[in-house]
Regions:
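Regulatory and interdomain segments flanking nucleotide-handling catalytic cores
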Residues: 1-274
């Protein structure tokens, strides 16, 4: 027979449980994670596009997609990750932590922090091995020091979660993708022009400056740099199975422009409910 803990029960009932909030069930949920003070964290990394940082964000997104119950779609750009969750595949489908806001935010932020720091060190070590093989220590000395500091300091993420109507999910992703494109243009501009030269310039102005003065066409940049990266489940051919395929999470570095292909996102949330 369990011993009644009157003090513990009172603390939970009167105080701890009173602060708990829950999102609405059977309605899409967005979890958005942001790197804390990443402007400082990435200050001495390569610009406009650091491969180690970019690969780390992609792997962190994939880790979250694989390990957060109900996640259907992930999207990352810059230092942020957006996840789309549903809990209505079937009538009996459970929600992640019952859609408790405190649990979802604290644990997703912890997961992102753990994954990011693990992958960043992994990719830094692989880069260090490559530099060692080609004896490029002098050429990469400053960059190696920047990577060392990043590993020593470590990264942190914050997280927020919220319900969103099914028809608004794609609009949320359009918003973040448009932000990705704007950030990419501005970063490319900052790498080629002074702050004074860019003052008051729109993204279209910056693209024109890059083309006319530097012979750089923004449209020629890698798709994932311009639009971000996605993660979702896909059927993969498999020769060792009778059915001939298996379902795996994949990282898509060539996503469409969401505003021109809404179905690309909507198919993950418009599920026939049971």
């Amino acid at each position: 027979m369990a011993v009644k803990d009157s003090l513990g029960d009172r603390m939970k009932e009167y105080y701890e449980d009173r602060a708990k909030t829950y999102l609405t069930r059977r309605t899409p949920v967005i979890i958005r994670l942001d790197g804390k003070a990443f402007h400082s964290f990435t200050k001495h990394l390569k610009k406009p596009h650091d491969k180690i940082f970019h690969d780390t964000m992609n792997s962190t997104m994939e880790y979250l997609c694989k390990n957060i119950q109900g996640c259907k779609f992930g999207y990352t750009q810059s230092d942020e990750i957006t996840l789309v969750l549903v809990d209505y595949d079937k009538l009996e489908t459970d929600a992640w932590f019952g859609y408790g806001v405190q649990k979802m935010c604290s644990i997703s932020a912890s997961m992102a922090t753990l994954a990011f720091n693990t992958y960043f060190k992994k990719y830094r070590d692989e880069f260090l091995d490559a530099v060692s093989a080609f004896q490029d220590f002098d050429l990469e000395a400053d960059y190696l020091e920047a990577l060392r500091k990043c590993v020593d300091v470590g990264a942190l993420f914050d997280s927020r979660c919220f319900n969103i109507p099914t028809e608004e999910v794609v609009n949320c992703l359009i918003w973040r993708q448009q932000d990705a494109t704007r950030n990419a243009i501005q970063m490319l501009g900052q790498c080629n022009f002074s702050h004074r030269e860019l003052h008051g310039m729109s993204c279209n102005d910056i693209q024109d400056m890059l083309m006319l003065q530097k012979d750089i066409n923004f449209n020629d940049m890698p798709t994932d740099y311009k639009r971000g990266t996605c993660c979702y489940k896909k059927e993969i051919p498999c020769s060792d199975r009778l059915v001939g395929y298996k379902t795996e999470w994949v990282i898509d570095k060539d996503p469409p422009i969401f505003s021109k292909d809404r179905e690309f996102v909507e198919k993950w949330v418009y599920i026939k409910e049971c």
